From Swiss-Prot:
This is Gamma-aminobutyric acid receptor subunit rho-2. Changing residue 299 to T: Loss of picrotoxin resistance. Disulfide bonds join 178-192. Residues 21-260, 315-325, 465 are extracellular. It comes from Rattus norvegicus (Rat). 4-aminobutanoate binds at residues 105, 169, 197. PANTHER family: NEUROTRANSMITTER GATED ION CHANNEL. Rho subunit of the pentameric ligand-gated chloride channels responsible for mediating the effects of gamma-aminobutyric acid (GABA), the major inhibitory neurotransmitter in the brain. Rho-containing GABA-gated chloride channels are a subclass of GABA(A) receptors (GABAARs) entirely composed of rho subunits, where GABA molecules bind at the rho intersubunit interfaces. When activated by GABA, rho-GABAARs selectively allow the flow of chloride anions across the cell membrane down their electrochemical gradient. One of its GO terms (biological process) is visual perception. One of its GO terms (cellular component) is chloride channel complex.
Length: 465
């Protein structure tokens, strides 16, 4: 009996437990059914998630390794280049360089950047994509300074076409070296070159070429320089060899400049010519006016020195002679010779006066001597020389006593030279004429100096112009 009681009690408890759990299961199931979305709602929720999710990029930049060039291991990738010169900013003779602003464009094909497109339209990007893909490593050979413009943003444009063709453009200002020859300065023409080359890839990996030949280089018609006339722009290309790395394709932008001469005519040639002509004025000044002729000669010499110094200060120090140096130094020699010419005239005048003074002391008595004629070298007399009184013109007729002294001096000189005729008559005549007429050197200089300077100018401009 106790066993039967225990079994009945156990069954009763079990049934009570089952019955007590049935309502709770229904409430839980009902709550789940009311909060459970329908099948249609789940489908709409998935569509929303697809629409608002992150779109997959068309270029698939993350799927490729762009540290390697396109078609790595195959033939060299061709990279076309064209350039549009925006401005030629400056030419420096002292630093031997030039500054140019240009648009540099590269063209190549990278199949890794191909994307599907029904309209075959390209996609344009700014400079941020350049850091994620492969671009040609072109640099400027012999450049001193260069930079990419960044106002208001980096002036870089990347355009990708559906078939993988890429256009890469940037705006650059570069200062590059230009080897100049100043042997004809300022009547010279200079040819400068801007050279482009791949830094790392040899001609076996990258073939750099002008995309459209000479048409690949375009210039702005408004480009002008203050001191130069731009004559010609043209392109060339060749291979450059480095002993440690190999052969590289190199592109050249060549341009020829011809210097404007008018500025230097006003600043250099015209002042130098005026100084030479001013030095000739001393030939028309009386040789007895020592202060006037000396001061004029010194002034012209110093002015020429200033002109030469000013020209050299604005030019590089070269080890050869330039055309302007020839003109300035020849002009300086003409000015200096005009000073030496007066030194010779003054010296000969002093010697003549000393000789006359000695002869005056030798023949002190001139009483009753009223000759109106003087004796020449051959023993004859000349009335004109008597009036000239040993080289003085007729307009300067002296008092009677001094005139008689001059006549005696003149006769004494004639007698001395006549006695030495055997040593050379012609030499004595020329020496006597120069000593008696020291102003004759000025007369000859008035013709000789301008004539030689004109001949020099004709030769100079015919050779260098």
């Amino acid at each position: 009996m106790p066993y039967f009681m225990r079994l009945a009690l156990f069954l009763f408890c079990l049934m009570a437990l089952v019955e007590s759990r049935k309502p709770r299961r229904k409430r839980w199931t009902g709550h789940l059914e009311t909060s459970k979305p329908s099948h249609l709602y789940k489908k709409n929720l998935d569509v929303t998630k697809i629409r608002t999710g992150k779109p997959r990029p068309l270029l698939r930049v993350e799927d490729h390794d762009f540290t390697m060039r396109p078609a790595f291991g195959g033939p060299a990738i061709p990279v076309g280049v064209d350039v549009q010169v925006e401005s030629l900013d400056s030419i420096s003779e002292v630093d031997m360089d030039f500054t140019m602003t240009l648009y540099l464009r590269h063209y190549w094909r990278d199949e890794r950047l191909a994307f599907p497109s029904s309209s075959n339209r390209s996609m344009t990007f700014d400079g941020r994509l350049v850091k994620k893909i492969w671009v040609p490593d072109v640099f400027f050979v012999h450049s001193k300074r260069s930079f990419t413009h960044d106002t208001t943003t980096d002036n870089i444009m990347l355009r990708v076409f559906p078939d993988g063709h890429v256009l890469y453009s940037m705006r650059i200002t570069v200062t590059a070296m230009c080897n100049m020859d100043f042997s004809h300065f300022p009547l010279d023409s200079q040819t400068c070159s801007l050279e482009l080359e791949s830094y790392a890839y040899t001609d076996e990996d990258l073939m750099l070429y002008w995309k459209n030949g000479d048409e690949s280089l375009k210039t702005d018609e408004k480009i002008s320089l203050s001191q130069f006339l731009i004559q010609k722009f043209h392109t060339t290309s060749r291979l450059a060899f480095y002993s440690s790395t190999g052969w590289y394709n190199r592109l050249y932008i060549n341009f020829t400049l011809r210097r404007h001469i008018f500025f230097f005519l006003l600043q250099t040639y015209f002042p130098a010519t005026l100084m030479v002509m001013l030095s000739w004025v001393s030939f028309w000044i009386d040789h007895r006016a020592v202060p006037a002729r000396v001061s004029l000669g010194i002034m012209t010499v110093l002015t020429m020195s200033t002109i030469i110094t000013g020209v050299n200060a604005s030019m590089p120090r070269v080890s050869y002679i330039r055309a302007v140096d020839i003109y300035l130094w020849v002009s300086f020699v003409f000015v200096f010779l005009s000073v030496l010419e007066y030194a010779a005239v003054n010296y000969l005048t002093t010697v003549q006066e000393q000789k006359e003074r000695k002869l005056r002391d030798k023949f002190p008595c001139t009483c009753g001597m009223l000759h109106s004629r003087t004796m020449t070298l051959d023993g004859s007399y000349s009335e004109s020389e008597a009036n000239s009184l040993a080289g003085y013109p007729r307009s300067h007729i002296l008092p009677e006593e001094e005139r008689q002294d001059k006549i005696v001096v003149h006769l004494a000189l004639n007698s001395e030279l006549t006695s030495s005729r055997k040593k050379g008559l012609l030499k004595g005549q020329m020496g006597l004429y120069i000593f008696q007429n020291t102003h004759a050197i000025d007369k000859y200089s008035r013709l000789i100096f301008p004539a030689f300077y004109i001949v020099f100018n004709l030769i100079y401009w015919s050779v260098f112009s």
